[in-house]
Amino acid sequence: TQLLTKTKAFCACENRYGGMPDTRVCPVCLGLPGAMPRVSKGYVELGAVAGLALNCDIATYTKFDRKHYFYPDLAKGYQITQYDLPLCSDGYVDLPLAHFPKDEQIGGEKHRPTNFKGEDCIIDNKYRRVRIERIHLEEDVGKSLHLEGKHSYIDYNRCGTPLIEIVTKPDMTSPDEAALFMQTVQEILRYVKVTKGNLEEGNMRCDANINLNVWEDGKLYHTPISEIKNLNSFRAIKDACTYEVQRQLKEFEEDRQEFNPGFKVTMGWDEAKGVTVVQRTKNSFVDYRFVVEPDIKPFTVSEELVKSAAEKVGEQKKKKRTRFQEEFGLT
């Protein structure tokens, strides 16, 4: 999710969507030799606002790290992110049960009172809870443009754009729930004014990790994990997840391949054809050579910053909705 700072995460370039390619770049966001990053004003606080809005704990001490990998849209060969000390952790989002199909609501045939760990996930008989493992700060990369012909192009205007990455626990069990989660997060983060939240502009993007639990002959099987990258609409999330579930089930029935904790398939979504396509297979323990970002020292998150972030969150939207319903009899 891209944040609404005036400048990019670690330089003074304007943080704005669009424009002529490669016109809002500088030596810092391109990673040129000798260029030194600095944390832009408001970046950490906006990350804390998002974390508090999503019911997270805010770290008192954190740092930035370098994640090394090669890809054409990553000009400097590494991405500034947070590895082992994320800014936010242990949050949750409550999804209204009324938005689920009737058979998944209280008393329905597919009603799920607990998550995969057996913990209660139904709150006040009104909400289904999805836990958030962590929210970390990182910079965006450039944008690849695949036009007709033999060539692809890179627009580096987007590189260095301030992001938060929201990582959930594996609590969602259907494509509808995944799409509803994304809609709810968009609604919350727009409400606290940390992002525009326009999926069509890339302000929010979704990577969906999917595998199946298959009961057969009294035994539980787990299919290999697939990660569908860069889903940019609620329909794409729902349709891609629906197709991938069907593809995995068919593949399991044909070759009985089971979950391998060290293996993951990266998929893309071909919206025109309505299918997922393999982009690459990889060891999920791939070595990104994480190291502490040497040009940005670790820092303490002050009580004043957290207090200021809490004031910007104000009364959360769910609580305000409940209060309006009780005080004014709204439905």
Task: For each feature predicted by the language model, list its residue ranges.
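Basic, nucleic-acid-interacting segments
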Residues: 1-315, 320-322, 326-328
